[in-house]
């Protein structure tokens, strides 16, 4: 899709910090880091979101997510990982090319409601 920023990243027209790449997916650091190491995993074929994907394409994407998430956790020293997929604007999707967010979580960034009140 000509005006899709993720398609342009996949085509090499826009630079990215690649984390993983194979024939089906590309994973790269999100330009708007929620936490250090925040990575996006995108299929190389353009789909608006998961709701538009066929079963095989969905399987190809999600089969790679755990391995990429483990590699990001190892590289960043994260204690955990949020794995998130938003579908449509009402659900928080802002780029309309299917993508999965890998947001590493760190114990040093934890706080409780008690700590927030101080």
Regions found by a protein language model. Name each.
Residues 37, 109-110:
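Short acidic/His/Gly/Ser-rich catalytic and metal-binding motifs that mark active-site loops
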Residues 44, 87-90, 95-105:
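Histidine-centered catalytic micro-motifs
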Residues 1-45:
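Active-site microenvironments that recognize anionic phosphate/pyrophosphate groups
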Residues 77-88:
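A short glycine-rich, hydrophobically flanked beta-strand micro-motif that places a catalytic Asp/Glu
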Residues 111-116:
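Conserved small/polar residues in nucleotide/adenosyl-binding loops
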Residues 50-76:
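Helix-adjacent hinge/juxtasegments
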Residues 46-49, 109:
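A short, flexible beta-alpha/helix-coil linker loop
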């Amino acid at each position: 899709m000509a005006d899709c920023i993720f398609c342009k990243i996949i085509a090499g027209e826009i630079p990215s910090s690649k984390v993983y790449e194979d024939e089906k997916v590309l994973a790269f650091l999100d330009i708007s880091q929620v936490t250090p190491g925040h990575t996006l995993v995108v299929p190389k074929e353009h789909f608006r979101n998961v709701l538009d994907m066929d079963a095989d394409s969905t399987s190809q994407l999600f089969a790679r997510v755990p391995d990429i998430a483990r590699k990001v956790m190892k590289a960043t020293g994260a204690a955990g990982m949020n794995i998130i997929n938003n579908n449509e604007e009402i659900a928080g999707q802002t780029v309309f090319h299917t993508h999965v967010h890998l947001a590493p979580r760190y114990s040093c960034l934890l706080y409780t409601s008690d700590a927030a009140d101080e």
